[in-house]
Structure formats: C-alpha cells, structure tokens
From Swiss-Prot:
It is a multi-pass membrane protein. Induction: Up-regulated in cells exhibiting reduced susceptibility to azoles. It comes from the Eukaryota. It comes from Saccharomyces cerevisiae (strain ATCC 204508 / S288c). This is Probable drug/proton antiporter YHK8. The chain crosses the membrane at residues 75-95, 112-132, 142-162, 171-191, 201-221, 228-248, 308-328, 343-363, 387-407, 413-433, 448-468, 478-498. GO terms for biological process: proton transmembrane transport; transmembrane transport; xenobiotic detoxification by transmembrane export across the plasma membrane. One of its GO terms (molecular function) is antiporter activity. SUPFAM superfamilies: MFS general substrate transporter.
C-alpha cells in the first residue's frame, strides 16, 4: 500500500502518454538497434517516428534492465539515506537553538523560526522542483538541488547575522525537498511493480524517522559550538552529493528515450526519430510547467472538501510532532531534569512506534486484496482507509497517555510509551490518507500529494511557534490534553468518508467517480 501511493505520486504527470500500435523496421540493423515505432506523426510533410523501449530486446539506454538487484538496492539506499539526512536537518535545530539564542541575542520565538522556515521550504520546494525533474530528469534535479541545499547550509552555519541564518535555513529546505518529492519516482524507475514494496516502504519510513534522529545529533554535540551540529550534517550531505555524482545514473524513462532517439538519429543519419519528452520540451516551458504544478494543487485544496479535510488531518499529525520539538525539552527538563542527550533520546519513542508500524503495510495490502475479492473484484478508494481506522484511535490514545503521565512521581518511560503509541498512530494515518488520495484522485494524484505536502509542512512549521508558550501557560498536562482532544475530533473522519465517500467523490471536480 505504501508503495502504491508513492509510485503514483512520483510518476503521475502531464508527460504520460498512451501506448499506440507498434511498428518495426524491416532490416537486421534496425532490429539490432531495437527501434520500436509506437506512433507516427506528421512534421513538415515527413513521417516521423516516436521511439520507445522494446520489452523483448534490451536497449543500452534502458539501464533498469541491465541493473543487478544489488545495484538497484544500492541506488535506492543512497537516495533513501539522503532523504533522511534532509529531514534530520529540520529537527537538528532543536537543541542547538539554546546556543543560537545566546549567540545572536534573540528571543525563543525568533529562534523557533529556524524550524519553521526550513519546514516551509520543504513544503514549497516540490511545487517548483517536481516540474524540473519531469522536463530534465531525476539525476540533474538531484545534483542541482542538493548542491544548492549544501550552499545554503553553509550560509546557515557561517552567517554573521540571524537574518542570514534564517534565509539559509529556508533555502536549504527548499532545495533539499527534491529528495522528498522526486526520490520516490526515482526508486519506482528501477524496480518492477512486484519488487518495489520493500524498498519503497523503507524509503517512506525513513522520511518519518529523520525528524526523530535530528535532535540526537544536536544532543551529542550540544557542548560544542552550535555550528558543529550543522557542520556534521553538511559533511554528510556533501558525502551524499559526491556519491550521487559518481554512482547514480539517470533513471527517468522519458530522458533515457531522448538518449535513444539521439543515438538513432546519429547512427541512421535520420532526423525523423524523436522522443515524446523532446516534443514536450518544445511545447512547454519550465515556467509554464511550474505554474501548472502550483495551480492545480491549490484548486484541489479550495474546491474539494474531501481534500481539505484529509490535508488538515495529516497536517495536524505532523504539526504535533514538530510541536514536540519545542515541548519535549521543556517537559523532560522541568519534570525529570533531563540533560541535552537525554532530551534528544526522548524522541526515540516516536521513532520506535513508526518502525514497529511499518511492516503492517504488507498486511494491509493483503486485507485490501481480500476486500476487493469479497466485493466481486470491484475496488473502491474507501477500502484504503483501513490503516486510518487504527490511526484515528491510536493518536489520541498516545497523546492522552503522554499528557497524564507527565508527573515527577511517574517514571519517565510512561510518557515515552505514550509518544511511541502516538508515532504508530501517525504512521497509520499517513498510510491511509496517502493511499486514499492516490486511489480516489487517480489522474490528479500527483497534484493531490503536492497539495497534501504543502498543507502538511505549513502546519508543521506554524505549530512550534506557539508550542512552548502553550505548555508554559496551560501546564504540561492540560496542553497535552488539548492536543489529544483535537485528534479525538478527527476520529469520525475515516468512518464518515467510508460511508459517504462515493457520494462526495461524485460531487468533486477532481476525484474519481464510480
């Protein structure tokens, strides 16, 4: 299930074309070149030929067919690790912020912008970087985006003004977001559909684990200069960039077809061979592609009530996690006198909850297939809500446990257990919402996911701005109770959508109607 929504999110685009009748060239040389004529078009009165890959004979450009399983997993592992580093940077600000406040003589509220602006960048960046990958390929997008992210990380580290630091945080998140929006498609490029479940599940989980690991880096280096936390992640990002430069090839099929078309034009001395992406580039500018990629997600958000509710739901879950990045240091230092490293390790509970929940995606997929079979082979998007049924209850349960076990006379492991249950619930909520979004919106799945990412990151960036003040003014227990009650209000969502989903989809201008 996790694999399916990620594949659809990464690969749905305006560049997809329908298959047409295959033709072949009647010559031995053409057979060796493995030319597949899948469509014909008229250009200046001459017949032109669109090239594609033949399933029977491997083209040299069709690199996915030549890759060993080990190399596929190496590429997906490197992309996954880089994605995790990008998300670690978002929360690594948590503990060094104390030193940043002292160094720049700023308030806690201003310091919190270091988290907020980075997460804003993660939410806004995909709207601009995804079209870049669809026109120019995965590899060049990764290289330029990670290089620019590293450059802006340098500004964050060595800027002499807090304005420069914040500007660097936003732009490093903006460009780093390519590994959250494009990476899933790159992994889908090199694995067959029946093999992609495990690598995609690992990739998806890593994006959630990164924020939990970030504070651990900050805690380990807390007694050093605040810069060393970010220098460590800068060096790690640089190592990832070097490895990507030398070991990650282009995987985007439309780009590989351009290479094949160029080879055929050169070898056959015939300029009539073309790839669809070449035509798309001629007819679509990068600016127009960016405009379309930003217009449709906002249309979905404003005109579709289902999308608005689902975006708010996932945004709320992620926002609470990021609120904890300012709340945990206050709670565990005040109640249990935790030091920096102990505070950093307190986030492991959320991480453990997500890790334990990840394998269930295979079980939910089996359950989905059973439901389809039971329904005479007819599947509906609402069948994807099963993980959300569990997540809807686990998230408030975890928050209630955390809220009412935060006492000095209660062992610190109790609220950590509550955070683990909450983390598990968050994973189920995201799995159910993402799978439903892809299945219900189909043609507009990529726009739906972009819309969800934008709302999610905006909410996650806003909540830390008032989190500490809320815990100080309301008290640890009542602030936690308030968060739990907000998630309780969301419990009916999957049940109402399961009952009325078909009716709501029929009224939606974007959703798939039965």
């Amino acid at each position: 299930m996790v694999a399916e929504f990620q594949i659809a999110s990464a690969q749905s685009s305006a560049l997809t074309s329908t298959e047409e009748e295959h033709c072949s060239i009647n010559s031995d040389k053409a057979a060796k070149l493995d030319l597949e004529l899948t469509s014909e078009r008229k250009n200046d009165g001459k017949q032109s030929h669109e090239v594609t890959f033949n399933e029977d004979i491997a083209d040299p450009e069709d690199i996915a067919r030549h890759m060993s399983t080990a190399r596929r997993y190496y590429i997906s592992s490197l992309i996954t690790f880089t994605s995790m580093v990008i998300t670690m940077i978002s929360s690594s600000w948590t503990l060094p912020s104390t030193h940043i406040i002292e160094h720049f003589h700023i308030s806690h509220e201003v310091s919190t912008l270091g988290i907020t602006l980075y997460v804003f960048g993660l939410g806004i960046g995909p709207l601009f970087l995804s079209p870049l990958s669809e026109l120019y390929g995965r590899r060049i997008t990764f290289l330029y985006a990670l290089t620019l992210s590293i450059i802006w990380q340098c500004l964050t580290i060595w800027s002499k003004t807090i304005t420069g630091v914040m500007f660097g945080r936003f732009l490093s998140g903006f460009f780093g977001s390519a590994f959250l929006s494009v990476a899933g498609g790159a992994i889908a490029d090199i694995f067959d559909k029946d093999q992609i479940g495990i690598p995609m599940a690992i990739y998806t989980t890593s994006a959630f684990l990164g924020p939990s690991l970030g504070p651990i880096i900050g805690g380990a280096l807390y007694h050093q200069s605040y810069k060393w936390t970010f220098i460590t992640l800068l060096i790690t990002s640089g190592c990832c960039l070097v490895m990507i430069i030398f070991t990650i090839p282009e995987t985007y099929k439309p780009m590989l077809l351009i290479r094949k078309a160029k080879r055929l034009r050169k070898e056959k001395n015939d300029q009539r061979y073309y790839a669809v992406l070449e035509v798309t580039r001629e007819q679509t500018s990068l600016l127009s592609a960016i405009f379309l990629s930003t217009k449709r997600p906002f249309g979905l958000l404003l005109r579709d009530r289902m999308m608005g509710v689902l975006c708010f739901y996932t945004g709320l879950e992620l926002a609470i996690i990021y609120l904890y990045f300012v709340a945990f240091p206050y709670v565990f230092k005040k109640l249990y006198n935790f030091g920096p490293m102990e505070i950093a390790c307190s986030y492991i509970g959320i991480m453990v909850g997500m890790i334990l929940s990840a394998p269930t995606c295979l079980l939910f997929q089996k359950t989905f297939e059973w439901r389809v079979k039971r329904n005479n082979g007819v599947k509906t998007p609402e069948m994807r809500f099963e993980p959300l049924f569990y997540g809807a209850f686990l998230t408030p349960v975890g928050l209630f446990i955390f809220a009412f076990t935060c006492y000095k006379h209660v062992h610190w492991i109790a609220p950590i257990i509550g955070s683990a249950i909450f983390g598990s619930g968050v994973y189920f909520v995201f799995t159910g919402v993402f799978a439903y979004t892809v299945d219900a919106y189909r043609r507009y799945a990529a726009s739906g996911m972009a819309c969800n990412t934008f709302v999610r990151c905006i909410m996650a960036g806003v909540f830390p701005l008032f989190g500490l003040q809320m815990y100080k003014s309301m008290g640890v227990n009542w602030a936690g109770f308030l968060l739990a009650m907000v998630t309780v209000a969301m419990i009916p969502v999957p049940f109402l959508f399961t009952k009325y989903g078909a009716r709501l989809r029929a009224k939606s201008p974007y959703a798939w109607d039965d």
